[in-house]
Amino acid sequence: MRLTFIGADHEVTGSCHFLEACGLNILIDCGMEQGINKYENAELPIPYSDVDYVLVTHAHIDHVGLLPLIYARGFRGQIMATRATCDLCDIMLKDCAHIQESEAEWKNRKAMRAGKPEVTPIYTMNDGEGVLHHFVPCNYNEIIRLNDNLEIRFVDVGHLLGSASIEIWMKEDDCSKKIVFSGDIGNKNKPLIRSPQYIRQADYVVMESTYGGRFHKNTGDHVEEFARVIQETLDKGGNVVIPAFAVGRTQEVLNYIRIIKEKNLVTGYGVFPVYLDSPMAVEATGVFKDNMMDCYNEETKELVKKGINPISFPGLHLSITSSDSVAINFNEEPKVIISAAGMCDAGRIRHHLKHNLWRPECTILFAGYQAVGTLGRSIIEGREEVKLFGESIEVKARIEKIEGISGHADETGLLEWVGSFMEKPSQVFVVHGDDTVCDAFAETVKETYGINAMAPFSGSSYDLKEGCFVTVTKGIPIQKPAVNEATKKAAGVFARLLAACDRLRRVVMHNEGGANKDLARFADQINSLCDKWDR
């Protein structure tokens, strides 16, 4: 019985753990790294063709995004996941494969012009579709036997539709052990899905720490906040544009708007139109509808039993085609537009920002986390002008953010989850958190509950039978590529350009007070130069 840590160790994305037990090779999650990562990930110590099972906690790309890659490299085992996770992966993995192919095509157009080698995508649509045939839908709370000595069970963890913690019982000779993988732990009292379900016993626990050291703000009634913004914006004749993640957050927003309409909290506009402009979000909304009775909380299931769809309402328009999307911005009626991507760095939301950001009567309403470096973050932080499709757009719309909406448990929720075990686990392994957060949260677990807790690095392995580490690694920082002479020269030329920019500013200031005619001609020349090089 050996556990090897592969991904999301001292990092937040790329979750992957390798369990060798009872004659089986098992991966728990197989996620793609996203954003900036600090450390290298260890390679799987066996060929992918030797992996028997992958157990999936939920359908987010940082937990499933490399499944098509291991399929391309020979994996032909079974992928065990809840029914809703299987359904969502059908959407997510095809979309991810499409992105890989599109990015490779774009890079190849540039490479061809520069005489550089061809770039191949890390996997193709064929791989994305091929791996889907290996998914096996599982029910919550049902014990599933993988062989005579190893059983698993999925327990709702309240992070996303279909999300789960995974319990694994193992027996080798006269030694029996149980390990629990938390998956991403959800917030309590979410509007649609259940709160995290607690597990009472485990010898070992592998748990996430995404929001370790952070505490959600309790901002009150989200429905009232949405209603206020919609009312005030429609009163001014503007549009409310809501950037939202296609899976999870979009459906929560739809539920809030349903309640607003049901209670008539926005008045004077009858059945005001709401456009859901994201093909993936439309598909995901269908998955939510198909899995209502398996995944919804009791309050929401009561609505379903009464014939009420909690994520649909009069005035909801689903936009599928590009022409549907374009038509939205030619419709002058004040409206609500929900579109992806949630951080505004891709997708149809960028078109809606282009058409609405410059209008002071409109509101851009953020209902989700905006990472550093994203367009959404820059708008929230007060950027006065942004660039969209090569065009500079002034930010004159009202910018609003609803606080406290999160799919992740904060530190209080994380501690409540790990503190729910009736007997103290022998060891807690803290993963899926930023470098310092992992270590700090492990210390918090120790101090709060007296449980052994630590945050391993990728490549470390632990003998579950003996209760000790076999291999302890340190984080290997990702090395930046060496700068060659050509790059150094390019950097020198760019420094000249920056110096020229400084000189231009000095010249502009020197001409303050000049004749209006001369200043206008000077401004036109600068703008003409900018137009030439703004590409």
PLM region descriptions:
Residues 229-374, 386-387, 444-448, 497-535:
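Hard-cation-handling environments
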Residues 387-418:
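Generic long, charged, amphipathic alpha-helical segments
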Residues 100-105, 292-305, 387, 470-492:
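A polyampholytic, Gly/Pro-enriched intrinsically disordered region
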Residues 150-154, 287-295, 415-416, 465-476:
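Short, surface-exposed amphipathic charged segments that create phosphate/polyanion-binding patches used
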Residues 94-99, 103-107, 221-223, 256-261, ...:
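Short secondary-structure boundary/capping segments
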Residues 459-518:
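Charged, amphipathic alpha-helical linkers/stalks
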Residues 1-55, 60, 64, 71-252, ...:
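His/Asp/Glu-rich metal-coordinating catalytic cores
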Residues 359, 434-479:
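C-terminal, active-site-flanking charged/polar segments
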